[in-house]
Structure formats: C-alpha cells, structure tokens
Amino acid sequence: MAKDIKFSEEARRSMLRGVDTLANAVKVTLGPKGRNVVLEKKFGSPLITNDGVTIAKEIELEDAFENMGAKLVAEVASKTNDVAGDGTTTATVLAQAMIREGLKNVTAGANPMGLRKGIEKAVTAAIEELKAISKPIEGKSSIAQVAAISSADEEVGQLIAEAMERVGNDGVITLEESKGFTTELDVVEGMQFDRGYASPYMITDSDKMEAVLDNPYILITDKKISNIQEILPVLEQVVQQGKPLLIIAEDVEGEALATLVVNKLRGTFNVVAVKAPGFGDRRKAMLEDIAILTGGEVITEELGRDLKSATVESLGRAGKIVVTKENTTVVEGIGNSQQIEARIGQIRAQLEETTSEFDREKLQERLAKLAGGVAVIKVGAATETELKERKLRIEDALNSTRAAVEEGIVAGGGTSLMNVYTKVASIVAEGDEATGINIVLRALEEPVRQIAINAGLEGSVVVERLKGEKVGVGFNAATGEWVNMLESGIVDPAKVTRSALQNAASVAAMFLTTEAVVADKPEPNAPAMPDMGGMGMGGMGGMM
C-alpha cells in the first residue's frame, strides 16, 4: 500500500491538531466542577463518563496524521491508568501543555534534543520534590478523603474506607452491578472459592439452601473420587471423631457420591463434597493455599500419596465452613501462622515478577484470601447509563486509594504540582535545556488553570495567586475558597500525580523529537455501479 509522508513542521502541526482534539474533549472533565462526556455505543445505551482514559480510548480521527497525535496522548492516559489507576485527565492536560509549549519553541528554532534534556531534568526534580512533600496515609478518614475526591462522592469514600478497613490493604475489593438503587458493601471473611456442593442433598439448612459445618475436618486432594473404598479408611477415622467432613477433590462422582449422600441422609455422618477451584497449575496452587490455611496436606500422587494412606493427621481443620450452591467459604482455618506468612511472601514475590495482567489479578486474589478476605461493592443506580458511569467512578476511586496507600498523599486540585514549581525553577541550565525546563514549568500550571476554567473562573488569576501561597494551601474549586488542602481533605495520591507527570513528559519529549510521520494513503472510493435502468425485460421481446 502507498504511503503518505510528512516532514518536520508540517508533520508536527498535523499531529498537534489530533492532540488538541483529544485533549480538549478530555480536559472538560477535570476538577470538582468538570463536565461529563457522552460516548456513543454500538449496542445499548450511550456511556456518560468523566473518566479520561475511557474517553481517550473511544476517540478515532479520520485524518491519519491527526489520529496518530491523538493516539500518542491516549497512550499517556492509558499508561497512567495502568500504573496508578487514576489521574488520566491530569496526564492528558500535562501532555497537551508540554507539547504545545514545546512546539512553539521548536518552530522558533530550538533544538528538540536540548529541549528533551531540559524536560527530563525538570521532571526528575519535580518527582523528587513530590516524594519529599508527600505524607503517608493514616487512618480510615484519610482513605475516605482520597476515595471521595476521586469519585466526587462522600458516600463512596466512606464505603471504600470501610472495605479497606475490613479486608486490609492486601485484601481484594471487587465491584459488582447491583439489582437495586443503592450502593452497598458485602464482606466475605476467610477464604472463599467459587465451587458449590456436589449434591443438594448435602445441605444442612433447607431455608438458605446451604451446608454449614462446625469444626470440620477437610480432605484436600487433586484426584477424582469415584470409588468409596479409596476414602473409606479416613472416613471411618473421621466418624470416630464425631466431626463433620468437607471433601475438596477434582470431582466426586458415581458410587462414591451416592454412598456419601445416603450416609448423610441417614444421619451416619455430616459430609459435603465440592470440586477443587481453578484449573491446571492454578488449581494446584489454590489447593496448596487451602492446605496451608487449614493446617492440612494436599493428597496427591505427585508427592507419592494416595487416598487410602490418608489419616486424620493429614486433614485440614477450620472453625466453620459454609457451602452454598455456588461458593465455599472457609472461616478460621487453624493453619500455622508462620507457614501462612511464608506463603503470602511467596505470592508477593510472584506478583512482583509477573508481567501478565491476568496472572497479577489471580495472584492478588489468592493473596487476599490468605491475608484478609474479599469485599464486594455492589453498585446500584436508577438507570443502566448511570450505573455504568457510577461504576467507572468507583473503580477510579478504588485505584486512587490503593495508590495513596503505596506512596502517600499530596495536596489535591493540582496544588502539589504548583508546590514543586520553585524547586524546578531553581535548576541551573542554559540554552535549549533552560527552555525545556520552562516548558515543564508552564505545564505544571495547567491542571490548576483548567480546574478553575471548568469552575467558571479565570484560570490565570488563580495560578498567579497560588504561586504566592504557602505549600499546601490551594484553591477549592467546589466552594471557591482558599484553604489548606490537606486539612480540608482535598488530596491526591502521590503515585497518581507522579505517574501523570512522568508519562506526559515522556510522550511530549518523543513528540518534539519527531521529524517525519508516515501514514497509509487513503484508498480512493470505488466507483459507483452504473445505472441498470435500461436492462428491463421489455427489450428482450425479439428473443422469444
């Protein structure tokens, strides 16, 4: 396919139009008085959102060169979302400001490589200063503030703070769509996995349709059990102890299942069988987790063990187990705390090494089940459109809170970027490097300016006043007051601000050093089919 090539100024100008188109659509959402953007969906109702990365991903421009510019900035939002989970609009605003300011200087004759060096120096200094002024997050109220600012909803802030308090910082907090109008929190203590009883005849509570086992033994194996003779020796030992039994196996079927059900119905002993969670290697790892949590062993041929050799000593124990049609929850496993800690450490090490998003999610789930528990926030709303928008906001708030726990918090509302202004301005440089530093200085003002503009105020007036204020004092766009941002609970996670600045600078530097752009030439439209009007059947009379 033939290519279209543009060089230097023409190339950069074409891409800048794309940058501006995307950034202008995204930046209207910034701040407490930011507006929403409506996105058309091919199926279902349109999506209304103020989430920068969601908007950026939807934008596709007709002109190939403009589209490349737009995609570069979308990459800033996407990367910031991957690293910090929030701050995508701030990242987009910073990138646009650096690109526009940089392009003016390149057009005026500045060397792009010199500008790049200056930008990198300035961003390094800004990040060091951000780390210095960040404060560790302490207590439930701080967590609630971070989540409330991100979601623009105090109720959501309280909900997330409560969830994190209940399951710990390593706990898993998931979002589900609720059938009702209200948003509520559901916390599962202990370890839960998504496998239910093998037969409904095993239930102990017919009203709730669940089986509850108090102080049970737990047989854990990766084998399929179809012959009752295989587990008869260990069954007899459990019956002698007078305790209930939970069997976790690849499957329990045929004669073995029938015998267990008959004995359960006769009241000989209380037993529930469930399938092992997960698949393949993940199943082995999860069975090992359950064994460590309950102080039992996984009976597997890989370790030279068969079911006939199993004894009561090789079974796990727990305070209580609840089995429903779809889930099994193990509460108060009596495993050795040192072994559990070692296992948690092992999973954390795997988390740091993995590059797969899917694996990371599954490891995080396993970690939470061992370390704390799982909290589910059930998101409710009046309409499907509102539900989608609310779910996106809560997701951002959740990511924001996790980022705050990791690296602490800084003053919100773009104030922290202005607080590092003096440090960046004090860097000694000359020529194009100094110009690069000035580009970053100009960009640092942009989030505050845009928040003020979205609140219907003159951005430059707010920026100039902020330069003269003490560190931590900023403009509360929601009320129009000048306040101490940290004391007023207007905070941003340091990680979110840092990621936004780093990613914006990275893309801006790449943009400014671009000298040629290559795109596919648009294919000419195929000619329309000729009119077939003259080929009526009437003209064929002579052929009869």
Curated annotation (Swiss-Prot):
Subunit structure: Forms a cylinder of 14 subunits composed of two heptameric rings stacked back-to-back. Interacts with the co-chaperonin GroES.
Subcellular location: Cytoplasm
Function: Together with its co-chaperonin GroES, plays an essential role in assisting protein folding. The GroEL-GroES system forms a nano-cage that allows encapsulation of the non-native substrate proteins and provides a physical environment optimized to promote and accelerate protein folding.
Keyword check for Cytoplasm: yes
Membrane-spanning ranges: none
Molecular function via GO: ATP binding; ATP-dependent protein folding chaperone; isomerase activity; unfolded protein binding
Catalytically driven reaction(s): ATP + H2O + a folded polypeptide = ADP + phosphate + an unfolded polypeptide
Predominant location: cytoplasm
Keywords: ATP-binding, Chaperone, Cytoplasm, Isomerase, Nucleotide-binding
This protein's GO CC annotations: cytoplasm
Gene behind this protein: groEL
CDD domains xrefs: GroEL
Annotated protein name in UniProt: Chaperonin GroEL
Source taxon at top rank: Bacteria
GO terms (BP aspect): protein refolding
Family statement: Belongs to the chaperonin (HSP60) family.
Binding sites annotated in the UniProt record for ATP: 29-32, 86-90, 413, 476-478, 492
InterPro entries: Chaperonin_Cpn60_CS (IPR018370), Cpn60/GroEL (IPR001844), Cpn60/GroEL/TCP-1 (IPR002423), GroEL-like_apical_dom_sf (IPR027409), GROEL-like_equatorial_sf (IPR027413), TCP-1-like_intermed_sf (IPR027410)
Entry EC no(s): 5.6.1.7
